[in-house]
């Protein structure tokens, strides 16, 4: 049976530049899942806020999948919290669009707490089940205490969503445990479905070709990919560099960051100067997703030094390109990384621990290193085809349960 699915992503456009203030793994998740669901014959409309006046209202994401921009406040990039007063307007525009175009949806799948607010409101109007995925949890961020404190408005909204939505999708068992612990969510209403990786895009390239393409030579390349925010622990990665053998020609490449991340970027650049490693560090800025496989393939390893990840999509992308990973014990890293084979997991992001595992990977002889193709094979079960199948099964389960009670 074909499903008509309304996805809501108010603050983050799935086609936005990755690595910026409002665009990251969630944007990739929504775009890839919508595309794969459309390929399977389901109809998917993704609703997002117009953040530029030049946007086409409707953009095709793929077969049966559309991105629809709705006006809610000024058509410009604004802080996430500043979007909250415009959520009612967004919901009103969404319902107007649906009515005008004669659309019917079987279910709502919202992403992030702002979208969850809209989903709760619209659900009562449409009388269909509301499934949410929060992607990160404000209470967890506050418990960690790194970066800007999340407001009570977000915490309370997430608690309400955990109480009255019809299903919460968590990308990892750890995130499920957080939902239960911090928000008293019912375990029976939480389903764990991991994130996926585009195996057609993220694939191994010849290292020499990738390095030539990026004008890199024989340096040992350590890669970071992600948003430039304190929670990512990039400062800890920089502080790990002095622990490494300086006899090697090291190059650290940091990908990510836009005008919304300037304060953190300047802090990190200043830190690299204090550590006297600024000549070893390249702040690459934003990189288009289609170019990322060149960086992953050119790198000797990728590091995920985060304090918190709900899943850890970057690790999947790196491994799919055949490049090993050193990551903190966050998200689903224990299920993604094969310890000592495709990478290492550290209990926290203490610089000496990160440096130790980087050194271990770099010291492995090529005969002991798992072959690039084997590293890639370790994550093929995370194809978007498999993730979409799991999502559809969950949608059907929720629909059957919802309408059996009506």
Q: Can you describe what each PLM-predicted range is?
A:
Residues 307:
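Aromatic "clamp/platform" in nucleotide-sugar-dependent glycosyltransferases that forms part
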Residues 1-67, 403:
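N-terminal subdomain of nucleotide-sugar transferases
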């Amino acid at each position: 049976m074909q499903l008509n699915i309304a996805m809501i992503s108010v603050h983050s456009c799935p086609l936005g530049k990755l690595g910026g203030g409002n665009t990251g793994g969630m944007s990739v998740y929504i775009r890839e899942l919508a595309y794969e669901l459309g390929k399977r014959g389901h109809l998917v409309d993704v609703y997002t806020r117009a953040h530029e006046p030049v946007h086409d209202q409707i953009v095709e994401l793929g077969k049966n999948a559309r991105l629809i921009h709705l006006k809610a406040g000024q058509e410009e990039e604004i802080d996430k919290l500043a979007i909250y007063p415009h959520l009612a307007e967004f919901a009103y525009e969404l319902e107007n669009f649906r009515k005008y175009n004669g659309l019917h949806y079987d279910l709502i799948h919202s992403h992030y707490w702002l979208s969850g607010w809209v989903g709760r409101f619209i659900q009562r109007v449409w009388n269909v089940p509301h499934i949410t995925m929060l992607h990160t949890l404000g209470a967890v961020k506050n418990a960690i205490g790194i970066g800007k404190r999340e407001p009570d408005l977000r915490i309370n909204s997430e608690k309400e969503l955990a109480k009255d939505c019809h299903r919460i999708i968590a990308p990892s068992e750890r995130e499920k445990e957080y939902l239960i612990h911090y928000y008293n969510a019912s375990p029976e209403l939480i389903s764990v479905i991991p994130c996926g990786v585009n195996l057609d895009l993220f694939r191994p390239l010849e290292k020499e070709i990738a390095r030539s393409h990026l004008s890199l030579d024989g340096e040992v390349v350590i890669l970071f990919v992600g948003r430039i925010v304190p929670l990512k622990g990039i400062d800890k990665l920089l502080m790990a560099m002095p622990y490494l053998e300086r006899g090697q020609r090291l190059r650290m490449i940091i990908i990510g960051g836009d005008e919304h991340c300037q304060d953190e970027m300047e802090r990190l650049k200043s830190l690299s100067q204090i550590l006297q490693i600024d000549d070893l560090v390249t702040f690459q800025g934003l990189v288009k997703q289609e170019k990322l496989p060149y960086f992953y393939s050119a790198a000797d390893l990728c590091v995920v030094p985060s304090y918190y990840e709900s899943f850890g999509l970057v690790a999947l992308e790196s491994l799919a390109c055949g490049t090993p990973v050193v990551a903190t014990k966050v998200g689903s890293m224990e299920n993604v990384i094969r310890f000592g084979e495709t990478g290492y997991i550290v209990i926290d992001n203490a610089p000496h621990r990160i440096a130790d595992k980087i050194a271990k990977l770099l010291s492995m002889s090529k005969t002991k290193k798992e072959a690039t193709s084997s590293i890639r094979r370790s994550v093929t079960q995370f194809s978007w085809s498999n993730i979409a199948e799991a999502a559809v099964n969950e949608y059907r389960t929720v629909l059957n349960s919802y309408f059996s009670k009506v």
